[in-house]
């Protein structure tokens, strides 16, 4: 749909700022709320309690009016070895995976899928030479395919390894086996380690 903007926040601060921006925007906006992060920044470890938002630097929501601009990604974790592109819940899972793997990964929170901050993505991938795209949707027809294609087109001569996608499996969502379907920190850490060896 022409003009449709797509928003997926990963923090309470961004959720408020992006929602106000969506309300004030003249075009239609689809606003996704990742339920897994309602109680705190879920890091993908379903067997541990979630740390509350009050312990997170972006958990506090400023009183009053403010907006977060569409099409402006934010780097949640600086790094120089590999660029990780994520949104929503996956931002926190990727941060945990980077810490656990010991890979110097730069984790970028896209915040909005349309418009997309291609400038931040390209700058990071040209710096690191590697890119891992992570999302919860299926591998086939997921937004990660578009991200991988854009990175390939814009950064081809800077890539030291193929773009890697870590996503849900190409199956209907299996509620009984949710945690084997969900791209958890172990799968992401393995991808980070693997792309460094490529």
Where are the predicted features?
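Residue-level detector of structured alpha->beta connecting loops
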Residues: 3, 26-27, 102, 129
